[in-house]
């Protein structure tokens, strides 16, 4: 929990290039964990913005030519200046443009964290996936039958890229190739409002600013899962969204420790 308190105390500046669908919620989620968001995306300014930031988030949702240029510029600056960065592989399972771009970004920018659902992870690893748009395909969902093989794939992807790999879903798998965590927190309603994955990437970017990449990533995923569970009593998805942000802001370390469901593998 030291990472949480450090972020709240230091209020790191997080540069997050994301999509217009979820940008407001992403900025508010970064604020909720105690960091400061800046969502600049113009190709002529992102180099300067990334350089003064303490972490970088890259989200491939709703990409445009300009954003593709900006993301690559920021990613390279982040790598050169050793600023922690996370890429969210939104849609690489259903779009060749995004898949090819993601491979180029990973090769040239060396992100500290690669995040996505299992369909996106299979696509980036070169395995046929069954993505349903930006959502995980039914055949790619982690089950008891494919649990071990999916963990091995995530570990291999981490070792090949040198990145912490975070595969999110009903069960979350986070690995740096040596240490692997399995997280079972969360609820169905997290998949019923748009942008929760994008919001999570903002939290990951905030927490890896501490330099603790594996632990910061795992903590962000645990936090989102537990706060989803705490928020699901509400009337519907609109109030769930608001309750989720409130719980991210107000949850205590004691509740996280009490409700966390995490195992090493």
Swiss-Prot record:
Pathway: Cofactor biosynthesis; thiamine diphosphate biosynthesis; 4-methyl-5-(2-phosphoethyl)-thiazole from 5-(2-hydroxyethyl)-4-methylthiazole: step 1/1
CC cofactor: Mg(2+)
EC code(s) of this entry: 2.7.1.50
Any one GO MF annotation of this record: magnesium ion binding
GO biological process, one term: thiamine diphosphate biosynthetic process
Catalytic reactions on record: 5-(2-hydroxyethyl)-4-methylthiazole + ATP = 4-methyl-5-(2-phosphooxyethyl)-thiazole + ADP + H(+)
Binding site for substrate: 39, 195
Stored InterPro entries: Hyethyz_kinase (IPR000417), Ribokinase-like (IPR029056)
Pfam families: HK
Keywords: ATP-binding, Kinase, Magnesium, Metal-binding, Nucleotide-binding, Thiamine biosynthesis, Transferase
Binding-site list for ATP: 115, 168
Family assignment from sequence similarity: Belongs to the Thz kinase family.
Reported function: Catalyzes the phosphorylation of the hydroxyl group of 4-methyl-5-beta-hydroxyethylthiazole (THZ).
Protein name (record): Hydroxyethylthiazole kinase 2
Annotated source species: Clostridium botulinum (strain Kyoto / Type A2)
């Amino acid at each position: 929990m030291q990472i949480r308190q450090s972020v709240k105390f230091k209020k790191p500046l997080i540069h997050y290039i994301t999509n217009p669908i979820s940008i407001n919620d992403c900025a508010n989620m970064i604020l909720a964990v105690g960091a400061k968001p800046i969502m600049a995306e113009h190709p002529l300014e992102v180099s300067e913005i990334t350089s003064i930031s303490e972490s970088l988030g890259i989200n491939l949702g709703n990409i445009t030519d300009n954003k593709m240029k900006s993301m690559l510029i920021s990613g390279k600056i982040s790598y050169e200046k050793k600023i922690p960065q996370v890429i969210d592989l939104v849609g690489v399972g259903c779009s060749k443009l995004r898949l090819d771009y993601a491979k180029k970004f990973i090769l040239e920018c060396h992100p500290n964290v690669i995040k996505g659902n299992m369909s996106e992870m299979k696509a980036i690893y070169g395995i046929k996936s069954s993505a349903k748009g930006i959502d995980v395909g039914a055949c790619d969902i982690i089950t008891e039958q494919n649990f071990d093989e999916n963990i091995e794939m995530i570990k291999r992807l981490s070792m090949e890229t040198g990145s912490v790999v975070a595969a999110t879903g009903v069960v979350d798998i986070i690995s740096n190739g040596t240490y692997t965590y399995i997280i079972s927190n969360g609820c169905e309603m997290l998949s019923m409002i748009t942008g929760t994955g994008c919001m999570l990437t903002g939290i990951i970017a905030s927490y890896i600013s501490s330099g603790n990449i594996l632990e910061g990533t795992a903590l962000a995923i645990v936090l989102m899962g537990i706060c989803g569970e705490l928020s699901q009593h509400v009337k519907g998805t609109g109030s769930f969204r608001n309750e989720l942000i409130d719980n991210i802001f107000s949850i205590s370390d004691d509740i996280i420790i009490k409700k966390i469901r995490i195992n090493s593998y």
